[in-house]
Amino acid sequence: MAHQFAELMFTQSVKAAQEQYGSRARLEHFTAMAGPNDELTEREAGFIAERDTFYMATVNEDGWPYVQHRGGPPGFLKVLGPKSLAYADFRGNAQLVSVGNVSSNDRVSLILMDYPNRRRLKILGHMRVESSGTDLPEYVAKVERTVYIDVVAFDWNCPQYITQRYTESEFALR
């Protein structure tokens, strides 16, 4: 368990639940031994570059969470630096729920999955949206917005209960 991630996620209510269900002492031990995990390393950058999908959560001004799936070619989510991610946002269904949500609360949570290898990376950050085109020139399609995420913390999650799933190309390699 990453120290910075636990600092942000383990609120008093969460700690009370951990205490009630008997996991608090174990999690305190893991957190105390862990590094801060507030800067992406080559390990995270490589994992992110291989992903062709992720899930992103935002919260609206009424406190309702919204989870969105984002997909593209492998590597469409770019690591710009040890604390910075970006992706090109193309025209979709025009609901703009996530874009609207971050105008009042810029906090965002991402989950990136590697189903075949049962790996999961959770990222917390602050999101900003720029409509003025893109500085991600490798995209040929019209980019409506560029989404930037300032990474605050991340955590690698245990593989337990991750159901293995394969794309056709991944299955062919087995």
Q: Where do the protein language model's features map onto the residues?
A:
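Binding-site signature for planar aromatic cofactors or substrates
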Residues: M1-R174
